[in-house]
Amino acid sequence: MTGKAPFFVILIAALLLLSSFFFGEVKAISTKQPKHRKLGNREGDENRSNEIVVQMKARVKRSKSKRGPQKKEPYKKPPCSPPTHPA
């Protein structure tokens, strides 16, 4: 029994080390999910506001045309062919 005891100790220690490694990965994946708002996490609100700002900047960049802003011609009313009022 004494010959197998160190083997079990090493096995248990290795399993503990590996399990902490795997749980670390699970934590890294689970932090990407949105957090519940009732927790009052100010960090999550900051990230959310930053995302909104980035989206607004991206929308502004897409709306510009390649040739630059162009002036629209104002609408000109066509002159009436039979003059109904004196000019």
Swiss-Prot record:
Residue spans of biased composition, Basic and acidic residues class: 40-49
Species lineage: Eukaryota, Viridiplantae, Streptophyta, Embryophyta, Tracheophyta
Keyword field: Apoplast, Cell membrane, Cleavage on pair of basic residues, Membrane, Secreted, Signal
Gene field: PROSCOOP17
Motif interval(s): SxS motif essential for MIK2 binding: 63-65
Described function: Brassicaceae-specific phytocytokine (plant endogenous peptide released into the apoplast) perceived by MIK2 in a BAK1/SERK3 and SERK4 coreceptors-dependent manner, that modulates various physiological and antimicrobial processes including growth prevention and reactive oxygen species (ROS) response regulation.
Signal peptide: 1-28
Region (Disordered) location: 32-87
Assembly and oligomerization: Interacts with MIK2 (via extracellular leucine-rich repeat domain); this interaction triggers the formation of complex between MIK2 and the BAK1/SERK3 and SERK4 coreceptors, and subsequent BAK1 activation by phosphorylation.
Organism: Arabidopsis thaliana (Mouse-ear cress)
GO cellular component: apoplast; plasma membrane
Short motif SCOOP motif, span: 51-71
Biased composition (Pro residues): 77-87
GO molecular function: LRR domain binding; receptor serine/threonine kinase binding
The name this protein goes by in its record: Serine rich endogenous peptide 17
Biased composition regions of type Basic residues, renumbered to the chain: 58-69
